[in-house]
Amino acid sequence: MGIQHLDVSKGGYSRVTFSKNLAFFTGHAAPQYQTLKEQAEGILKRYDELFKQFGLKKSNILYTTCFMKNADDEDEFADIYFQWIDPKNPPAGVTVTALPIQHSPVGDNILMELSFIVATNDSLPIKRYDVTRGCRMVEYDGMAYFTGHVYPKVDTLGEQVAGVLNRYDELFEKFGLKKENVIATNGYSKDGEQCGENGEPFNA
């Protein structure tokens, strides 16, 4: 099967793209609701509908990306999210404080946006490592998906980046992975003006 783009919008987005045993969802929001709790429940209800529509399973979610307007809302979202996912098969993922684009005419009250990467081939095993409420790493079809890591023990961005990368060195050794096989990275900084500090430890 090639690449399938489904429910393509006028804005140039596909609601979901299928490729190589994976489903990639565009971020979903629910600005018609006023509170974070209502928006989270509305988004997850919509994903229930979409998973049913496309024949997907919550137990096959590999990776979650959540953008939140207010960091103080994270615990409230987590309570709802962890009740919704399959507790025996939690995904890796990241939750980031960011300002989601406020879409008109859908509304200017977007408090969060949520997207998933989902496995589509039940014949391929999914391995989850260091499982608690979530998991540190998910392995599927020759790919490894890591939960986002932070290192708040030190003060500067450069020191935190170095600390995170040292932790990844340990994890790569633990799981038998190689840095030359890294396909993509995501890094999120509290202060965009400090992003230059990222370069030296990251490129080392």
What are these regions (language model features)?
Residues 1-166, 170-204:
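N-terminal presequence-like segments and the immediate start of the first folded domain
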